[in-house]
Amino acid sequence: MEQVVRIHASSGTTGKPTVVGYTQNDIDTWANIVARSLRAAGGTAKDKIHVAYGYGLFTGGLGAHYGAERAGCTVIPMSGGQTEKQVQQIMDFKPEIIMVTPSYSLVIAEEFERLNIKPEEISLKVGIFGAEPWGEGMRSEIERKLGIDAIDIYGLTEVMGPGVACECIETKDGPVIWEDHFYPEII
């Protein structure tokens, strides 16, 4: 444990959470691959990123946060919940990118609708969604309700959190594994 600088854990949805220790090299590599994923999703150093993944033992919030900083972006570390405040922060800070679960993005979209805020009035251009399964139907709904490009990012606590694979904004045809860091094995 002397090289471990951070502990993360899986959600434990199907049992006891899997706890994983990360070294400083793991954290640095992770920040680099999330930054690369942001660029693949169309992000640039000029962008503001609204991080609405939860912070804590779950890898989503901190992975998105440090990757966005590594990419040179301005981070709005909102975390999860507080939907009314999420919408207010988006309207106030005008981020171009949101990183959140796809299901919670629809909750945020419902709040925009409740406030009669139309997609064209929202600053968001891209959403990077992960941490749960979603399909093309949900992608279409998110894109329509928020007026954004919806991009899939993949990760898992046991390997490195979000950023193991990510879609490219030009094609949106499924996440690509960063094969210079990961070797998938299909059993």
Model regions: which residues?
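Nucleotide 5′-phosphate-binding alpha/beta core
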Residues: 1-9, 14-32, 36-40, 44-46
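Conserved S/T- and glycine-rich ATP-binding loop of Class I adenylate-forming
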Residues: 10-13, 49, 98, 127, ...
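AMP-binding/adenylate-forming
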Residues: 23-37, 48-107
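Glycine-rich helix-loop-beta junction characteristic of Rossmann-like nucleotide cofactor-binding loops
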Residues: 38-43, 67, 118-120
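Conserved helix-loop-beta element of the AMP-binding
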Residues: 48, 115-134
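Short, structured coil segments at secondary-structure junctions
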Residues: 71-72, 93, 123, 145-149
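Adenylate-forming
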Residues: 104-123, 140-145
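Conserved AMP-binding/adenylate-forming
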Residues: 134-187
